[in-house]
A protein has these predicted regions:
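Extended, compositionally biased repeat/scaffold regions that form elongated interaction surfaces
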Residues: 4-11, 15-196
Length: 196
């Protein structure tokens, strides 16, 4: 009885945390976007077996009509996104570089309007949406110091590393954090600042 109760509580906690993880994502092109974001560590959820409940796969239709299957933390993030966030993300991309696992273990799915990334494919790993001007700046190839460089690396393979938050907004400034820095975009001045 005690073990069954613990399992039910653990599954409920994991579900609640998964729903909280996605609060506050916004599209840089929208003037009526939400003003806050919440980051919650999935490590806080636990079940009696020590692992999070399995995440149900999500199937989407790409622009070319093919089916794209999201799994693990990418599926959890997409499933918990608001309808506005899903609309802003748009259709999933297909083809080379559109989805997969990077050399550093980061899992990702590119969309017309953004990307969802997670540090690894474990179901309990939080995933984040990066989009707009911040996504564009994150994808710029950079050297280890963060300066743009033709022979550098961009995105999660670059010096900023993987996303560690959804976009937050304070006034006209939107910010996304990464393992080794942050990117801000001011919608009033159109200025992007990268800090590594």
């Amino acid at each position: 009885m005690k073990q069954t109760f613990q399992r039910v509580v653990g599954v409920a906690a994991a579900t609640s945390i998964a729903l909280l993880v996605v609060a506050g994502c916004s599209n840089d092109d929208s003037s009526d976007s939400a003003a806050s974001s919440s980051t919650v560590s999935m490590a806080e959820s636990a079940t009696t077996s020590g692992s999070a409940a399995a995440v149900a796969p999500v199937e989407l239709t790409a622009a070319d009509g093919s089916t794209v299957r999201l799994t693990g933390p990418i599926a959890a993030k997409y499933a918990a996104a608001t309808e506005k966030q899903k609309t802003d993300l748009g259709k999933p991309l297909t083809g080379e570089g559109a989805s997969g696992t990077g050399a550093n273990g980061v899992v990702f799915q590119q969309f017309d309007g953004g990307v969802i990334t997670a540090k690894n494919a474990d179901d309990a790993t939080p995933a984040y949406i990066t989009w707009g001007k911040i996504r564009d700046a994150w994808n710029v190839k950079r050297d280890e110091s963060g300066a743009p460089a033709a022979d550098g690396k961009g995105g999660s393979q670059g010096p900023l590393g993987v996303a560690t938050s959804d976009e937050t907004e304070e006034g006209t400034v939107k910010t996304s954090t990464f393992e080794h820095g942050k990117i801000t975009w001011d919608s009033a001045t159109n200025k992007v600042e990268v800090t590594v």
